[in-house]
Amino acid sequence: MAIYELDGQAPDLPANGNYFIADTAVVIGKVRLLNSASVWFGAVLRGDNEWIEIGEGSNVQDNSTCHTDRGFPLVIGKNCTVGHNVILHGCTLEDGALVGMGSIVMNGARIGRGSIVGAGAVITEGKEYPEHSLIIGSPAKVIRTLTPEQVTAMGSAAKFYALNGPRFKNGLKKIG
């Protein structure tokens, strides 16, 4: 794994070692991972302007990019899932949110608790979405409110990655 200090600021990782950062992920500067957070292959978390926080049990999947601008920290709440090839830039994901593959979430945007951003959606700067929303399109719009059953079911993705992190941390062996 590539973990870098920048200008005297090193990433803040759980002292108990309860996290996973894949060996091809890059974590730079003002990045804080909480317990059971995971950062997967090819993901880049570049905390050179403001803090990036990855909440407890949350995951940033393969080839996703997390970055900030001055005045726009990036906060990923508890038990969130950030799908493959997502760009998060200076935004907030409230607890239990799921961002689908290939989506873009821009500065100042806020995704409500337990919401789903559909694959390929573009969340424009400063947009805020209520909890339990299904958000799709480019530009993204709320198309409906999720049922309680759907909100409960989507938590399984975060749980899967929270369990998969230790599996990879302890069982992955490079053979070539």
Q: What is the predicted role of each segment?
A:
Residues M1-N16, D48, E56, D62-S64, ...:
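Glycine-rich hexapeptide-repeat left-handed beta-helix
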